[in-house]
Amino acid sequence: MPTAYVLVLCDDNYPDYEIITQLNKLPCVLEVSKVDGPYDIVVKLSDNNMYMLKEAIGKHMVRIHRITSTLTLMPD
């Protein structure tokens, strides 16, 4: 099953928990974790359909306000 990890950078003036709540509502999301380091949140997504996975990242995630940047990692 295709899996993706998305590193999320958020607006510092906006509560992380609100973004985490919105991310948890997206299709294909399995886990959302707040982290320390250059990124604020790590999101794990998985789906049998690669198109649905890409759509969750490229269409739904980018619409969440206060996400300033993302980096998607897909293991081989």
Predicted segments with their positions:
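A compositional/biophysical signature of low hydrophobicity enriched in polar/charged and small residues
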Residues: 1-76
